[in-house]
Amino acid sequence: MGITEKACAWFESYLTGRSFSVPWLGQSSTVHHLATRVSQGSALGPLLFAIYTTSLGEITGSHGFSYHCYADDTQLYLSFPPDDHTFSARISNCLSDISKWMKSYNLQLNLSKTELLVIPAKPSIQHNISIQIDFLSLAPSKAVRNLGVVIDERLTFKDHVASVACSCCFALYNIRKIRPYLTQHATQLLVQSTVISHLDYCNAHLTDLPACTVRPLQMVQNAAARLVFNHPKGAHVTPLFIELHWLPLAARIKFKLLTLAYKVRDGTAPIYLNPLAKDYVSARPLRSSQDCRLAVPTPRSGQSRLFSCIVPQMWNDLPSTPRIGASFSIFKKLLKTLLFREHLLN
């Protein structure tokens, strides 16, 4: 890993000499020394675990899988044609090798929390999958949770919308009970931190979904605005949004996507987004060449919601002022003003 001298000594001092005891009824058990592991909840723990499991990529790569790791959560990805009948065996063999590797590293593959999601290329395609590992069977799930986002096999995100709406409604219910004791400003801060933040989390996945699918989330935002001002259920929300300087849900999603597009052009976006939004290069000199436009690919059937298709269109539809020569902070201010006028003042 290239860690030497003082840095290596610092890691060694962090990992060695640890012990623990259990308090019970005012007394503590005998102190036991830890030969492995560090204190649970340590800030450095996830990073050290990622370093410890670096060789996992060699195993997944040998079976043709890509993978992501987030602390102790590992996700494997495999793309295969519909007529491939060997993918079940490939998945089983890969999981079996991972289980053996974990045992050699004093780890354990938790099969009770292992989930399988198959996303077919077309809704009409059905896959009969049965994964066997360590005498246990693993069947495909209709939906799985990925860092708080519920992803279903059809990518409709209906389950995710229902989950977010449920958690937000519960938060609003609790705030409503203490609303008589809160000022308007305190209520606004509480709603923004416990409700609006949930609506904004990973909302880019909701791009171009049917209005009926995302309507529950918009209703949650409407209820949140009414709660801030302590207005009745039927109160009109547009004046409330204007006073709160809140963008409605559709505009918030568009704001998130366009800020990501700016970061892609600025080189500050995650690496995996860079190939999805490329600058438009004309075959001949044009006056529009200085407008900082993005290349719009021709989408295939069923791919109109792809980031690489919808974001360049949104970016090119912006006026030239936000797109050209603005810093990120200025771009966000101009973009919010533009969306505010488009969705609330017209």
Q: Language-model segments: which ranges?
A:
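Hydrophobic/basic alpha-helical segments
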Residues: 1-346
